[in-house]
């Protein structure tokens, strides 16, 4: 068992309260953009201007959808506290991914850049950014797992924590950090074997969605539909879309390779 006694609030300036969660989310975005810039420096066929504009579009569209899914999931709370809709907390990663992807797709229609290529380049950065963001969840005490004393558990002892105070819970945030870093390593290896047309991004979506469906049985969340939490439902939908698309593109690549 591990003890976490961290105040979720990193610092405050007057009425402005800055939490570790927000800091880690911001660092995750910085890590993602920095990764893409590094890839450009190493020869990736994307312009800096395209990436900057893409970030300006993807970040707000991702935040809007991340909040939207959480509002849908916790409508009873938000209907009684409408002002909380505009808070910086309560963001869903699937909403962020979907929103950012939609925003980038619209942008690509006007700018005519290769969206699949950009997404493939971004995948390792996305995974690194997610892992950093989950550190914020771990410090904040949100997104925790089942109660009870297991071989690997954490107990939050700061009164301001978002987790149940003084209760042993499964550190599902830490589990996900480890998974994301493993998937990051795998993505760096497998990227060399895939055509940069969106295949790596589809594989990432498929594997991460499968992970969220699995870890959802350990995490503590309200049921959304069919006895599953919202992330599990969304994960199943994303798998139903991403897996067939990935297989189709992979087969198409193999057929093309045989011809050439």
UniProtKB/Swiss-Prot annotation:
It is a multi-pass membrane protein. The gene is lgt. Belongs to the Lgt family. Its main location: membrane. It comes from Dehalococcoides mccartyi (strain ATCC BAA-2100 / JCM 16839 / KCTC 5957 / BAV1). Catalyzes the transfer of the diacylglyceryl group from phosphatidylglycerol to the sulfhydryl group of the N-terminal cysteine of a prolipoprotein, the first step in the formation of mature lipoproteins. The chain crosses the membrane at residues 17-37, 52-72, 85-105, 113-133, 170-190, 198-218, 227-247. It is found in: Cell membrane. GO terms for biological process: lipoprotein biosynthetic process. It is an enzyme of class 2 (transferase). A 1,2-diacyl-sn-glycero-3-phospho-(1'-sn-glycerol) binds at residue 134. One of its GO terms (cellular component) is plasma membrane. Keywords: Cell membrane, Membrane, Transferase, Transmembrane, Transmembrane helix. GO terms for molecular function: phosphatidylglycerol-prolipoprotein diacylglyceryl transferase activity. This is Phosphatidylglycerol--prolipoprotein diacylglyceryl transferase. Pathway: Protein modification; lipoprotein biosynthesis (diacylglyceryl transfer). Its EC number is 2.5.1.145. It comes from the Bacteria. The keyword Transmembrane applies. Pfam families: LGT.
